[in-house]
Amino acid sequence: MCIRDRPNAESSPEFTTYDAALDELTALSKEQRIVFVIDEYPYLAKAKPAISAMLQHIIDHKWTDSKMYLILCGSSMSFMESQVLGKESPLYGRRTAQFKIMPLDYKETAVFHPNLSEEDNALIYGITGGVPHYINKLDVRDSVDEALMENLFDRSSYLYEEPANLLKQELREPAIYNAIIKAIAEGASRLNDITTKVGEENSVVAKYLKTLIDLGIVKKETPITEKPGKKTIYLLADNFFRFWYRFVPVNASAIDSGRIAKTYPHAVKQYFPDYMGLIFEKMCQDYLLYYANDLPIELSEIGQWWGTDPKKKKQIQIDIVGTPVEGNDYIIGSCKYRNEKIGLDELELIREYAAVFGKGTNYHYYIFSKGGFTDGLLQAQERGEVQLLTPVSYTHLRAHETSL
């Protein structure tokens, strides 16, 4: 039922005050279940600062015996956490549930473009991070390249200004946050490296990093199975920020002068395989964690591991380590986003890395490859030594068939 459907209601009722509108909704909720949704609540709260106190009063005194179901939505995470969920908020203690809407994974993202190639869908996921709003704004029709030219590498486009606008909306000192994000995008991952690039003290940068982590822009990672410590690194968690800071600032001159269409092939596109490396690792991890139904162990968690090989005295990294719910069997995996076929040397390498990792008594090896596998590695799979997977379709990664 709408308000105008009620007996004696005007066809298009108008309310001169918020109290009048809320009173009408309250009356309706006495008769039937009402789901009252306020979208982008932060905008309303800024325009009408007293609205939270008004809702507090009506929740406490008028809706306790009603059938009202109130939903407050907002894209400003900092506002929702402090002004709605925070202890200082008039609404504190009155929520019955809260949901943080997470980005889509690669499989869910591909549903938006069922007619595009697997590689294009993977790239769209890598650019947008699976955020539906960004997927729609990128507006890929026939070509990702054309969509980027029109809807990102153009000063008048929505996505061109999005990171700056988000930082201004969420943060009081966007310049410092921008410098930190830029430093991480350029390869600084440890706290000391980031502070050197930013030119601030460690304690100052650590405080700002915490805020960026809370906002989901940055993530703090430690080698799986290990406690936070000297090995802790910082990465960009938001793929759209990662893409934007990787390709927009360095090409700003070409974008401003309108030369980006000419420079795009060698200044942007040729670096996509390198950029997609981390994205592909996440896709493979998600496949094992959420979609694979024939794993040899029940996974507790999945992630990366890095450390020092004491014999060779060099740093190594394992793309995928899957830990067991129980027992001492682990999954060890490698992800290669390149067109070349992967051979037996990769299997030998991850066996060496597993020995350095050293946490398990038995290891199950997985290799993901965009470009497929050599005959020798396929034969190793037939002998049960390794499981090989290729993105025959990014919407359904499946075991590589030896007949292919």
Q: What are these regions, as identified by a protein language model?
A:
Residues M1-D5, T395-T402:
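Conserved small/polar residues in nucleotide/adenosyl-binding loops
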Residues R33, S66, E88, N202, ...:
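Secondary-structure boundary/capping signal
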Residues N239-R398:
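A cross-kingdom feature that marks ATP-driven nucleic-acid transaction machinery
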